Amino acid sequence: MTPDPKRVLDAGEVRERLAGGLPGWSLDDDGIHRTIRTAGWKASLMVTTTIGHLAEVAWHHPDLRVSWGEVEVTLISHDVGGVTERDLALATRIDEVVGWRPGDEDGPFTGTPDDPRFAYLPPPGD
């Protein structure tokens, strides 16, 4: 049975889900949050546009705060006043797409060069 995408999850459920697969996300009264570090202004805009595309095709829109070197993301289902499966699903998709590092996997893509002039996202762990 598919969970009701509009059911508000209790705080314990949300924290458990964040701990089980969404590192970097946290919960407070305003929803779930993550700050994505970037390599600068252009990279922040690219991350914002990427999240905007994902949100639009999902028809579920986050609050974003964009600055040099980071993008803050807040997800909450405003129509029901809490965090739902939709928020967790979009957070997962954001992490998958924005965090994709093709140079770290065996495949046809090399990823961005190590040269900081071409940096998009900081190296993992930075």
Question: Where are these predicted regions, by residue range?
Answer:
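Long, contiguous binding/interaction regions
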Residues: 1-42, 46-126
